[in-house]
Amino acid sequence: MTAPTIAVRELSLRFGSRVIFDKLSFDIPAEQWISLLGASGAGKTSLLRIIAGLAAPTHGQVQASDGRPLAPRLAWMGQKDLLYPWLSVRDNVALGARLRGERVDRQRVARLLEQVGLSHCADDRPASLSGGMRQRAALARTLYEDRPIVLMDEPFSALDTLTRTRIQTLAAELLTQRTVVLITHDPMEACRLSHRLLVLSPPPGGIDDSHHLTGKPPRAPDDPALLRGQAALLQQLMRANG
């Protein structure tokens, strides 16, 4: 499947009299990583769920550039790995196919486990894995779905710094040629992985896309351009939150 551009137009979300965000319009370019940042409660996860078709906006629409439905072309990776504890790592990777009653491509599972460095524990249960290994298994499961659009809600936030850096690099390498939207609270992570940044202001929220990144992700953690971008983004986040 070819990754489309996602167009968000005049999107509003209200809960009773409370406005979460109002008339958001922006594009998510095809085959790029986009990071969505903002304070807690700004509506980042709600916005991602609307893009995924898991929630309805009060007003507005989300469309693909080719006019085809988005939902069948989406994969989701969240902060929690959501591995089934009674299944092996191998069976967790192919969980989507199992739930849909499809034949499991075992060669593809084996190839993905090799790519994420988990071939040696394919028959193990999740309880025996470290946090980083569990997230690598979740990444392999996301890749098995082979969707052109991947939505990620803070998938690396619970990991230690070194493990997070390694898995960021792995995800960036394995999710090339896909449209990726990543929610993160970490300016370093956003600047390291993204082609473009979107900052969501607190309610009633707006979108600020004025921050520009140079170079190609994933950027080295000591890249001077990344460090400058991180500082500028932190200032932008502070402005967005008053």
Predicted regions, residues:
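The feature captures the beta-strand-to-loop junction immediately N-terminal to the Walker
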Residues: L37-A39
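Conserved ABC ATPase "signature" region
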Residues: V104-C121
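Helix-to-loop junction immediately C-terminal to a conserved catalytic motif
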Residues: A52
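A short, proline-enriched helix->beta-strand linker immediately N-terminal to the Walker B motif
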Residues: Y144-P148
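Conserved structural motif at the start of ABC-family nucleotide-binding domains
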Residues: I6-V8, I20-K23
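Conserved ABC ATPase signature
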Residues: R125-L129, M133
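Conserved ABC transporter NBD signature motif
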Residues: H59-L74
